[in-house]
């Protein structure tokens, strides 16, 4: 699994929390102190908790489990898409539509519509339509792609959520809780850690910090998958023992 050192975290600003007046008292045990009215997160706590979270993601990925990356605010959006794409997993980075998990049946129908429209755009169907109708379908396809593009090939509910901001994505966390899907989340000093199975106390706003978490998670998935392929090959007798 990907290792992230305390030095890496310091350089990325993981230890900078929110202004003290916005704090959530439930995060008290993870706060080292305050500097210039900004809470400082105790990285002595964050590092082992981050390792625990990565271990869990590794165990899910090794069993071919599905990881859903969730980060819909501007600071996280691109990084979430990149990380999920790099490790061939899934993401929501635009807007969390209520019921995305708890109402999967309906979401599945929307995904089917998106795929139908994609096929139509490629097989010449759009060209046979009036300009207005083709434009309307293109707009519908773009809108669906924005919302569902990152989960259109998920093929069912995920096995774990990796959330960038517990406060901003509280609806996603609640849905996962209702369905018994484990949640790994970055939790800043202004957020509520309740409902998060693997809390990672850390800055959820700085782009460098967000990229650090996401890159480590993507690397962890890739390593676990590669390890699984080696094990499978050995079991199948493709790799000779030295």
Swiss-Prot record:
A family per Pfam: Ribosomal_S2
GO terms of molecular function: structural constituent of ribosome
Biological source species: Aeromonas salmonicida (strain A449)
One annotated Gene Ontology cellular component of this protein: cytosolic small ribosomal subunit
Record family assignment: Belongs to the universal ribosomal protein uS2 family.
Signal peptide: none
Matches recorded under PROSITE patterns: RIBOSOMAL_S2_1, RIBOSOMAL_S2_2
InterPro entries: Ribosomal_uS2, Ribosomal_uS2_bac/mit/plastid, Ribosomal_uS2_CS, Ribosomal_uS2_flav_dom_sf
Any one GO biological process: translation
HAMAP family per the UniProt record, alphabetical: Ribosomal_uS2_B
Keywords: Ribonucleoprotein, Ribosomal protein
Source superkingdom: Bacteria
Protein name, as recorded: Small ribosomal subunit protein uS2
